[in-house]
Protein backbone atom coordinates (compact mmCIF):
# COMPACT_ATOMS: atom_id res chain seq x y z
CA UNK A 1 0.00 0.00 0.00
CA UNK A 2 1.68 3.19 -1.18
CA UNK A 3 0.80 6.83 -0.63
CA UNK A 4 2.32 10.17 0.31
CA UNK A 5 1.56 13.01 2.68
CA UNK A 6 2.87 16.49 3.35
CA UNK A 7 4.94 17.51 6.37
CA UNK A 8 5.24 21.23 7.07
CA UNK A 9 8.75 22.61 7.55
CA UNK A 10 7.81 26.19 8.30
CA UNK A 11 5.11 28.69 7.43
CA UNK A 12 1.78 29.84 8.74
CA UNK A 13 -0.86 27.63 10.26
CA UNK A 14 -3.84 26.46 8.24
CA UNK A 15 -6.25 28.93 9.88
CA UNK A 16 -4.11 31.98 9.00
CA UNK A 17 -3.77 30.83 5.39
CA UNK A 18 -7.51 30.32 5.07
CA UNK A 19 -8.21 33.72 6.65
CA UNK A 20 -5.51 35.91 5.05
CA UNK A 21 -4.11 33.95 2.11
CA UNK A 22 -0.81 32.17 1.79
CA UNK A 23 2.61 33.71 2.21
CA UNK A 24 5.54 32.86 -0.05
CA UNK A 25 7.64 31.27 2.69
CA UNK A 26 5.54 28.15 3.26
CA UNK A 27 7.71 25.07 2.82
CA UNK A 28 6.54 21.46 2.81
CA UNK A 29 8.21 18.11 2.27
CA UNK A 30 6.49 15.02 0.92
CA UNK A 31 6.79 11.79 2.85
CA UNK A 32 6.23 8.74 0.65
CA UNK A 33 5.34 5.52 2.49
CA UNK A 34 4.92 1.86 1.55
CA UNK A 35 2.94 -0.02 4.20
CA UNK A 36 2.58 -3.80 4.64
CA UNK A 37 -1.17 -4.51 4.51
CA UNK A 38 -0.95 -7.42 6.97
CA UNK A 39 1.30 -6.01 9.70
CA UNK A 40 0.60 -2.27 9.15
CA UNK A 41 4.38 -1.76 9.30
CA UNK A 42 6.02 0.90 7.12
CA UNK A 43 8.40 -1.16 4.96
CA UNK A 44 10.03 1.76 3.17
CA UNK A 45 9.85 5.53 3.25
CA UNK A 46 11.32 8.45 1.38
CA UNK A 47 11.24 12.21 1.95
CA UNK A 48 11.26 14.51 -1.06
CA UNK A 49 10.83 18.16 -1.91
CA UNK A 50 7.22 19.24 -2.38
CA UNK A 51 7.68 19.67 -6.15
CA UNK A 52 8.48 15.97 -6.67
CA UNK A 53 5.42 14.08 -7.90
CA UNK A 54 4.30 10.82 -6.35
CA UNK A 55 5.07 8.92 -9.55
CA UNK A 56 8.62 10.35 -9.70
CA UNK A 57 9.35 9.19 -6.13
CA UNK A 58 7.78 5.75 -6.67
CA UNK A 59 10.72 3.85 -8.28
CA UNK A 60 13.14 4.90 -5.53
CA UNK A 61 10.63 3.88 -2.89
CA UNK A 62 10.05 0.42 -4.40
CA UNK A 63 13.79 -0.20 -4.82
CA UNK A 64 14.36 0.30 -1.07
CA UNK A 65 12.57 -2.83 0.02
CA UNK A 66 14.12 -6.27 -0.12
CA UNK A 67 10.90 -8.06 0.82
CA UNK A 68 8.98 -10.17 -1.63
CA UNK A 69 6.01 -8.06 -2.71
CA UNK A 70 3.14 -9.72 -4.54
CA UNK A 71 1.01 -6.64 -5.24
CA UNK A 72 1.28 -2.88 -4.79
CA UNK A 73 -1.78 -0.68 -4.32
CA UNK A 74 -1.58 3.04 -5.00
CA UNK A 75 -3.96 5.81 -6.03
CA UNK A 76 -4.42 7.22 -9.54
CA UNK A 77 -1.44 9.60 -9.17
CA UNK A 78 0.76 6.53 -9.72
CA UNK A 79 -0.92 5.57 -13.03
CA UNK A 80 2.16 6.31 -15.13
CA UNK A 81 4.43 4.19 -17.30
CA UNK A 82 7.32 4.95 -14.93
CA UNK A 83 5.47 3.31 -12.02
CA UNK A 84 4.12 0.39 -14.03
CA UNK A 85 7.56 -0.26 -15.54
CA UNK A 86 9.16 -0.39 -12.08
CA UNK A 87 6.49 -2.83 -10.86
CA UNK A 88 6.99 -5.03 -13.94
CA UNK A 89 10.76 -4.99 -13.42
CA UNK A 90 10.30 -6.28 -9.85
CA UNK A 91 7.50 -8.71 -10.91
CA UNK A 92 4.92 -6.99 -8.68
CA UNK A 93 1.24 -6.98 -9.60
CA UNK A 94 -0.10 -3.42 -9.99
CA UNK A 95 -3.32 -2.40 -8.21
CA UNK A 96 -3.46 1.17 -9.51
CA UNK A 97 -6.76 2.53 -10.84
CA UNK A 98 -6.47 4.01 -14.33
CA UNK A 99 -7.37 7.65 -14.78
CA UNK A 100 -10.81 8.52 -16.10
CA UNK A 101 -11.04 7.86 -19.84
CA UNK A 102 -7.67 6.04 -19.88
CA UNK A 103 -6.66 4.13 -22.99
CA UNK A 104 -4.95 0.78 -23.37
CA UNK A 105 -1.16 0.70 -23.34
CA UNK A 106 0.61 -1.50 -25.89
CA UNK A 107 3.04 -4.07 -24.64
CA UNK A 108 3.15 -5.93 -21.36
CA UNK A 109 0.83 -3.83 -19.20
CA UNK A 110 -1.71 -6.59 -18.52
CA UNK A 111 -2.68 -5.41 -15.00
CA UNK A 112 -3.38 -1.89 -16.17
CA UNK A 113 -5.15 -2.94 -19.37
CA UNK A 114 -7.44 -5.24 -17.34
CA UNK A 115 -8.29 -2.30 -15.09
CA UNK A 116 -8.99 -0.10 -18.14
CA UNK A 117 -11.25 -2.82 -19.62
CA UNK A 118 -13.10 -3.09 -16.33
CA UNK A 119 -13.47 0.70 -16.22
CA UNK A 120 -14.93 0.75 -19.73
CA UNK A 121 -17.34 -2.12 -19.05
CA UNK A 122 -18.74 -0.72 -15.83
CA UNK A 123 -18.34 3.00 -16.51
CA UNK A 124 -16.16 3.57 -13.44
CA UNK A 125 -13.40 2.02 -11.35
CA UNK A 126 -15.85 0.94 -8.61
CA UNK A 127 -16.24 -2.68 -9.77
CA UNK A 128 -12.50 -3.11 -10.32
CA UNK A 129 -11.74 -1.67 -6.86
CA UNK A 130 -14.19 -4.11 -5.26
CA UNK A 131 -12.95 -7.22 -7.08
CA UNK A 132 -9.23 -6.49 -6.49
CA UNK A 133 -9.60 -5.47 -2.82
CA UNK A 134 -8.15 -2.08 -3.73
CA UNK A 135 -9.94 -0.66 -0.68
CA UNK A 136 -7.17 -2.12 1.51
CA UNK A 137 -5.08 0.82 0.26
CA UNK A 138 -6.65 2.83 3.06
CA UNK A 139 -4.17 1.06 5.37
CA UNK A 140 -1.46 3.42 4.03
CA UNK A 141 -3.69 6.42 4.75
CA UNK A 142 -4.31 5.08 8.26
CA UNK A 143 -0.55 4.79 8.85
CA UNK A 144 -0.11 8.42 7.84
CA UNK A 145 -2.95 9.50 10.10
CA UNK A 146 -1.45 7.59 13.04
CA UNK A 147 1.96 9.14 12.42
CA UNK A 148 0.59 12.68 12.23
CA UNK A 149 -1.58 12.20 15.33
CA UNK A 150 1.14 10.60 17.44
CA UNK A 151 4.27 12.36 16.19
CA UNK A 152 3.03 15.58 14.59
CA UNK A 153 2.63 16.86 11.06
CA UNK A 154 5.70 19.08 10.87
CA UNK A 155 9.47 18.85 10.76
CA UNK A 156 11.54 21.00 13.11
CA UNK A 157 14.97 20.86 11.46
CA UNK A 158 15.83 23.35 8.70
CA UNK A 159 18.59 21.38 6.95
CA UNK A 160 17.26 18.93 4.31
CA UNK A 161 19.49 16.05 5.47
CA UNK A 162 18.31 16.67 9.02
CA UNK A 163 14.70 16.64 7.83
CA UNK A 164 15.24 13.29 6.13
CA UNK A 165 16.73 11.88 9.35
CA UNK A 166 13.86 13.35 11.40
CA UNK A 167 11.22 11.86 9.08
CA UNK A 168 12.90 8.44 9.14
CA UNK A 169 13.06 8.60 12.95
CA UNK A 170 9.30 9.28 12.94
CA UNK A 171 8.77 6.24 10.72
CA UNK A 172 10.91 4.04 13.00
CA UNK A 173 8.99 5.28 16.06
CA UNK A 174 5.68 4.51 14.33
CA UNK A 175 6.90 1.00 13.47
CA UNK A 176 7.92 0.39 17.10
CA UNK A 177 4.47 1.47 18.28
CA UNK A 178 2.85 -0.72 15.63
CA UNK A 179 4.89 -3.74 16.73
CA UNK A 180 3.88 -3.08 20.34
CA UNK A 181 0.32 -3.81 19.26
CA UNK A 182 -2.44 -2.30 17.21
CA UNK A 183 -5.64 -1.37 19.02
CA UNK A 184 -8.44 -3.89 18.77
CA UNK A 185 -11.81 -2.36 18.03
CA UNK A 186 -15.07 -4.03 18.91
CA UNK A 187 -18.44 -3.06 17.53
CA UNK A 188 -20.91 -2.05 20.23
CA UNK A 189 -24.59 -2.26 19.31
Language-model-derived ranges and their functions:
Residues 1-19, 23, 35-37, 90-92, ...:
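Active-site- or DNA-interface-adjacent structural scaffold in DNA-acting proteins
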Residues 3, 33, 40, 58, ...:
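Mobile genetic element proteins and their domesticated derivatives, centered on retroelements
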Residues 24-30:
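Short, flexible loop/turn motifs enriched in small residues
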Residues 30, 68-69, 91:
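A general structural motif
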Residues 76-149, 157:
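Helix-centered, glycine/charged polyanion-binding patches within enzymatic domains
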Residues 126-189:
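Basic, amphipathic alpha-helical segments enriched in Lys/Arg and hydrophobic/aromatic residues
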Amino acid sequence: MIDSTGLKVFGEGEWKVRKHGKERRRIWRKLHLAVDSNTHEVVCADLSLNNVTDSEAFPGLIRQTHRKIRAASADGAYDTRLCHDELRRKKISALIPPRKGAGYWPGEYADRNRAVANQRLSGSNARWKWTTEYNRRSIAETAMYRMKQLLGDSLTLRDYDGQVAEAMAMVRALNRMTKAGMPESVRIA
